[in-house]
Amino acid sequence: MDALRNAPAIVIAEGYATAGSISDGIAAPVVAAFDSGNLMAVAKALHDKYPDKAVIVAGDDDQHLLGNPRVRRNVGREKAEMAAEAVGGKAVFPIFAPGEREKDCAGFTDFNDLGTKSKFGMAAVERQLKPAIEKAITEKVKELERNKQQERSRSEGMER
């Protein structure tokens, strides 16, 4: 937990391999939720423990499930977006090279696939996530500053 305490932001991935690839790509700790259904609980627990940190949920984009008659939902994207929204965080999803998803939609869903299967490779993991993390940190800092200012204004109003 020291690594998370010292990290500039909390990054959460759905699976272990994805968390590993992201950690390698951004050179920072990443938490694996192990299942899309667990993203919400993990995001809330970490947000409660580290309320001053930006939360980024690096989600799976399960487009292939849209064609499955039993599912017909992009579960990975839905769960990641819900978890991020619940903690005021940001959900991010990998962007693949043109044509890669068309050849194997189920094989190109997450940041591990981006780093290990895409022609863009691990450099793309860094290129796609670092700006998203930096933006989330900047937004979190602004939010904290607004909250402090509002608190000061309330305190000054009570003293009068």
Features from the language model and the residues they span:
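Glycine-/acidic-rich phosphate or pyrophosphate-binding loops and their flanking alpha/beta elements
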Residues: 1-7
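Conserved beta-strand elements of the Class I
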Residues: 10-12
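TOPRIM fold recognition
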Residues: 8, 24-160
